[in-house]
């Protein structure tokens, strides 16, 4: 019998909690990630008031310096720790895959100088559209449309760009290049980037709207991932007849592998929380895992290096956390974590190599406190043990610590 009939895993995309031990091997604009600290620096520079996460125990997570504006509550209601990544990457897919039990020992390919001409020409031949060569390099997703959106509106050319992550992104104004056409082009780009020397983790469709000087990316983003190279705990659950519900871009990240119920993409964090709550209320969802990604922290504020906006986004989630808990059953378990860092006060515009926080709450637990520090895959090991599925993947279960 499962200790918890339902587990709800919520990934606050990019909400790291301090530089990882190997942060010196990862860089932003030539600066090592050694001083990155997403939550810490937001707390220091913008102020951070998250009383509901603090009540679970956020302020108790061991750190060299306590979070400046998040107190260590005297009587926390949950269990907390921080987790370290072992995989060779600091991107969304690597983080999520490791959380589900995989160790990425060979990183995907990244293109610091842009994509080879061969790839660009293939995309042009397939699409019948030219590619703006000046955009073909690592670029902030918002800056690239500011810089080249006006030209695209005039010429219909494609904006193809990358980042420090193993991704190929295609930005297209929805009134210039129809959504379905953009999706077809991205599907083709996916088909030509499945093996070295161009093995990419994701192809991302990045539609936007608006006028020059006031462009806005829309919720019609779509990710085209590769399937995990071996089974994750999602597959183990699905194979055992245990339901898995994906909220937000989770289905894209795993390419549908191991997902029994895709609840759709999020238009915003608030919409994602609404979808999670609707999922919790489903009469058919009596046992299994819900897996939610809330991406606004990362996409709207981390990459844009906007600590105040990031703070406000955290405040919004914290205000709605009681709603999530109110829709849980007594024998449910809520796990709140992240997939990497994206310090909005740091150099560059890309992710930062950090520990991730872990907050665990269940009404059925009578204890609380700090549990041993571990690794991302401890989450998958805990889920596997709870539901009694066989797993030979990495990770150490902390299920016994939740009492």
From Swiss-Prot:
Keywords: Cytoplasm, Isomerase, Manganese, Metal-binding. It comes from the Bacteria. Pathway: Carbohydrate degradation; 2-deoxy-D-ribose 1-phosphate degradation; D-glyceraldehyde 3-phosphate and acetaldehyde from 2-deoxy-alpha-D-ribose 1-phosphate: step 1/2. It catalyses: 2-deoxy-alpha-D-ribose 1-phosphate = 2-deoxy-D-ribose 5-phosphate; alpha-D-ribose 1-phosphate = D-ribose 5-phosphate. Coiled coil: none annotated. It is found in: Cytoplasm. This is Phosphopentomutase. It comes from Streptococcus equi subsp. zooepidemicus (strain MGCS10565). The lineage of its organism: Bacteria, Bacillati, Bacillota, Bacilli, Lactobacillales.
């Amino acid at each position: 019998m499962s200790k918890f009939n339902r587990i709800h895993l919520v990934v606050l995309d990019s909400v790291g909690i301090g530089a990882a031990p190997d942060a010196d091997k990862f860089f932003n604009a030539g600066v090592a990630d050694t001083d990155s600290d997403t939550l810490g620096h937001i707390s220091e520079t913008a102020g951070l008031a998250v009383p509901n996460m603090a009540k679970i125990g956020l302020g108790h997570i061991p750190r060299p310096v306590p979070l400046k504006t998040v107190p260590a509550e005297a009587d926390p209601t949950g269990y907390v720790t921080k987790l370290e990544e072992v995989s060779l990457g600091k991107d969304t897919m690597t983080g999520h895959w490791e959380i589900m039990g995989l160790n990425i020992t060979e990183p995907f390919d990244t293109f610091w100088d842009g994509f080879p001409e061969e790839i660009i020409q293939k995309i042009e031949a397939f699409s019948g559209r030219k590619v703006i060569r000046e955009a073909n390099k690592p670029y902030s997703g918002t800056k690239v449309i500011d810089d080249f959106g006006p030209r695209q509106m005039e010429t219909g050319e494609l904006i193809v760009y990358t980042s420090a992550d193993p991704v190929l992104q295609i930005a297209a104004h929805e009134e210039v290049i129809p959504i379905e056409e953009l999706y077809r082009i991205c599907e083709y780009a996916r088909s030509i980037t499945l093996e070295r020397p161009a093995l990419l983790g994701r192809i991302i469709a990045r539609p936007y709207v608006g006028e020059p000087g006031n462009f806005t990316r829309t919720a019609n983003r779509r990710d085209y991932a590769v399937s995990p190279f071996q089974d994750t705990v999602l597959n183990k659950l699905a194979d055992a007849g245990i339901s898995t519900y994906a909220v937000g871009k989770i289905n894209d990240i795993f390419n549908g592998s191991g997902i029994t119920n895709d609840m759709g993409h999020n238009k915003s964090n608030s919409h994602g929380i609404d979808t999670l709550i609707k999922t919790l209320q489903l009469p058919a969802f009596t046992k299994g895992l819900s897996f939610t990604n809330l991406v606004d922290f990362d996409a709207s504020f981390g990459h844009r290096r906007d600590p105040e906006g990031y703070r406000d986004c955290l405040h919004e989630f914290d205000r709605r956390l009681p709603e999530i808990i109110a829709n849980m059953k007594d024998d449910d378990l809520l796990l709140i974590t992240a997939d990497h860092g994206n310090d909005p006060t740091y150099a560059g515009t890309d992710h930062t190599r950090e520990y991730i926080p872990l907050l665990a709450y269940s009404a059925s637990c009578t204890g609380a406190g700090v549990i041993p520090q571990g690794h991302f895959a401890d989450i998958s090991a805990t889920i596997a043990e709870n539901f009694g599925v066989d797993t030979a993947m990495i990770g150490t279960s902390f299920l016994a610590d939740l009492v």
